[in-house]
Amino acid sequence: MHQHDSSINVNVAVLTVSDTREMEDDQSGDSIVASLEEANHQAVHRSLVSDESDEIATLVSGWAASPEIDAIIVTGGTGPSPRDVTPQAVLPLFADALPGFGELFRQLSYQEIGAAAMLSRADAGWIDVGLLRTPVFLLPGSPKAVELAMGRLIIPQLSHLLTVCRGKKTI
């Protein structure tokens, strides 16, 4: 297993998907930004959209094509309700999946919330646009789930993931 390089500062776009939240009360988005800043990464773009597949896909694909964005984190819309369309919007954009992320997230969630963890469709993968390879994480909208994903999975591996998927010369 390779040692991760935590010295790389990562520029991240943060998207909250919600029909009920406004930017002013977006606790999950705030938590993502705070976690990034604590790890010396930057939230360079932040948006909030409703649970509309086309809006989500358009924003995520646009961000993935931007050379100033290294990674994308989406929170919300990953549950089992008919309005939860984040996976349907984003997964078709993936060139490759990172299945271990969702598996580990549900395992860690199970330790905290029990069988309800199986309702999560948290996921991750890469979007390739030209020479850009952008990791994308899909998180639940719950602030506790975001804290778990950021603290235990994303922040500890984000710099290393960028090094591996883009190569040291392009970072």
Where are these regions (language model features)?
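Generic recognition of short, well-ordered alpha-helical segments
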Residues: 26-27, 58, 85, 148-149
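A generic local structural motif
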Residues: 1-2, 57-61, 119-122
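N-terminal small/polar loop signature for handling phosphorylated ligands or for N-terminal nucleophile
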Residues: 33, 37-75, 79-94
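Gly/Ser/Thr-rich loops at beta-strand to alpha-helix junctions
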Residues: 18-22, 78-81, 143-145
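Short coil/turn connectors at secondary-structure junctions
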Residues: 9-10, 67-69, 130-134
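Proline/glycine-rich low-complexity loops and linkers
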Residues: 86-171
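Glycine-rich phosphate/diphosphate-binding loop of Rossmann-like nucleotide-binding domains
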Residues: 1-51, 55
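Short beta-strand segments
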Residues: 15-18, 74-76, 120, 138-140
